[in-house]
């Protein structure tokens, strides 16, 4: 059985036991989180939500909070001695999918 959930402005296909990276969630390591915005549930019985499947949830455990690799941006104006270097590290949450309840 698999499901498509919506979190952090993205839609992700998940299965039980899978490890995924999502946008930062307000939870500590070891906490249980529930995703209730389930768009689609597939398997023996397929259910498509309008826009979400009623009563369907995906349970997960937070494994790690972290920050992604640094993305460096560099802008410059030729012949003007003007340049800007800036870096950004996006925070993420690593979760393990425990169960899909549909």
UniProtKB/Swiss-Prot annotation:
UniProt key word tRNA-binding: no
Disulphide connectivity of cysteines: none
Single GO MF descriptor: structural constituent of ribosome
Signal sequence interval, chain numbering: none
GO cellular component, one term: cytoplasm
Domain of life: Bacteria
Keywords assigned by UniProt, alphabetized: Ribonucleoprotein, Ribosomal protein, RNA-binding, rRNA-binding
GO terms, biological process: translation
SUPFAM superfamilies: L21p-like
PROSITE patterns the record matches: RIBOSOMAL_L21 (PS01169)
Record's subunit section: Part of the 50S ribosomal subunit. Contacts protein L20.
UniProt xrefs under PANTHER family: 50S RIBOSOMAL PROTEIN L21, LARGE RIBOSOMAL SUBUNIT PROTEIN BL21M
Record's function text: This protein binds to 23S rRNA in the presence of protein L20.
Family: Belongs to the bacterial ribosomal protein bL21 family.
Designated name of the protein: Large ribosomal subunit protein bL21
Native source species: Ligilactobacillus salivarius (strain UCC118) (Lactobacillus salivarius)
């Amino acid at each position: 059985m698999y499901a498509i959930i919506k979190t952090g402005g993205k839609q992700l296909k998940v299965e039980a036991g899978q490890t995924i990276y999502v946008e930062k969630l307000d939870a500590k390591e070891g906490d249980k989180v529930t995703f209730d915005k389930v768009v689609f549930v597939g398997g023996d019985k397929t259910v498509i939500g309008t826009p979400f499947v009623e009563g369907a949830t995906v349970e997960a455990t937070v494994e790690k909070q972290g920050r992604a690799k640094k993305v460096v941006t560099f802008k410059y104006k030729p012949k003007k001695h003007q340049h800007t270097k800036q870096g950004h590290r996006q925070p993420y949450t690593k979760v393990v999918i425990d169960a899909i309840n549909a």
